[in-house]
Amino acid sequence: MKTTTTKHRGDAAEDAALDYLRDAGLLLLARNYRTPGRGGGEIDLIMRDPRGSSGGTLVFVEVRQRSAGTHGGAGGSITGMKQRRIVFAAQHYLSRLRVVPPCRFDVVLVEEKITWLQGAFDAG
């Protein structure tokens, strides 16, 4: 039952992050995008930020939620391995596009309040 509870909390955090980003003007393109096969990656939200260059910026969003601030809180749970998996999934997503737009990797922390970290990490 704990898995179900954890999944429900994760889904609720993603819903809250999605609402927050939509209110900021971003547009949802995909949710829970997964690469095929084992060992791939997943991206919680893929959005487009229409501000800036023509066509906007493609935004790959990782949503993290922790009820307790221990162990670095929600932000402390984004390890280098997790970042590499997100980048791998983003590369897979981009390989399907004819034209690759500007991109960035954001993180939304859902704790007592929502914190949006734009450009939280890069693909390098």
Regions found by a protein language model. Give the residues of each.
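Domain-level recognition of nuclease-like catalytic cores that cleave nucleotide substrates
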Residues: R96-G124
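Conserved catalytic cores of phosphodiester-cleaving nucleases, focusing on short active-site segments
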Residues: I43-G69, I86
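Acidic-basic catalytic patches of nuclease active cores, encompassing PD-(D/E)XK
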Residues: M1-Y33
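Active-site metal-binding core of divalent-cation-utilizing nuclease and nuclease-like domains
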Residues: L27-G55, G124
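Short, conserved glycine- and acidic-residue-centered signature motifs
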Residues: T6-G10, E14, G39, I78-Q83
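Mg2+/Mn2+-dependent nuclease catalytic core
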Residues: S67-A89
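A short, N-terminal amphipathic alpha-helix
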Residues: F88-R96
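Structural motif
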Residues: G40, G56-F60, P102, I114
